Amino acid sequence: MKATVDAGAFFKALNRVIPLLKVSAIPALSEASIQFRDGVCTITATDLELWVQTNIPAEGDDFGVVLSGTKSIAKAGKFFRGPLTFSCADAAVSSPQITMACADKSAEFTGYPLKDYPELPRFTCEQAYTANAAQLLICIGRIKYAAQRRSDSRPVMSGVRFYRQQLYCVDGQRLAVCANDAMTVDKTFVVPADAMWILKAFGDQNVSVQVGTRYVCFAAEGLCAYVRRLETCDTLTPEAAIPRSERESYVVDRKEFLQRLTYLKECASPVKTTPVVYFENGCLSLQTPSAWYRAAIELPGRSEVAFAFNLSYMWDALQQFSGHEKVRLHVLSPVSPVTITAEGTDDVALVLPVRYRAAA
């Protein structure tokens, strides 16, 4: 069996799926598969949560194999030009012998049969949208700090929610919302935040966003990424979490706030894993076993509501507004979430307060 593709197109396509490949207890999952069928070469990589496929034109017989040493093969690709031929005497045996040849260069290796590679689950589109991949990636990059790491007990907390004209992450202690005016979602869906790096593969292209029962497919120009959906919790919405009223709000200098938090973070006891900062009328204070450390930020007037917060959580929330000089803090009470906004953006950050002992 023999099939031929253009070397440049093949290795460009292979390099688009390689970032997904990781060391796996199942050897075949550490590699990419190639399948020639009906004049098309399909290259696939998966970690069983995320699937990436890309297609290029091909000529020759129909067969498929799983590569061995995929990353090394990709490195060799920079020396190949013109027609690239893959040949295999019997692709169905347990250790198929594969020859890759291009002009005066060739490589021989032992691969895996395609039956050892998991099949892409059937996909039926239920919702379809169009969005710019680069804009989605920027938006998710601003808010993914509020997603938990993967957890078997609360997987939904590790996701990015596509909700109406918003994307948001929530982990139970904080909420980060990014406006997504270019895409209005009819029915909320959630995908793992740590899988959204795959959008980099699309560059600045507009992508088709197809939502199925179990997967969401992002596709453009021969590249498809299937991301496993997480369960949806309809009660965890921005409307339900963000306070509808406030007792006071004030504008602060974002960089100044971050500088004061940096100082307090350096002063925190090394054994205190979650330093808590007490905020009262512009004064930030942090208690360690040996001392109280204080720093002040400028407020436009007097603040009446004192509250405390996790230093790291507030730090992350302020970083969400990295393009803004000023941010506005909205406060209702010492036990209500602190909401952060900025002029010129519909982004919202929310940080839950923590219990505190007032400074002496």
For each of these PLM feature ranges, what is it?
Residues 1-360:
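Structural preference for solvent-exposed beta-strand-turn elements
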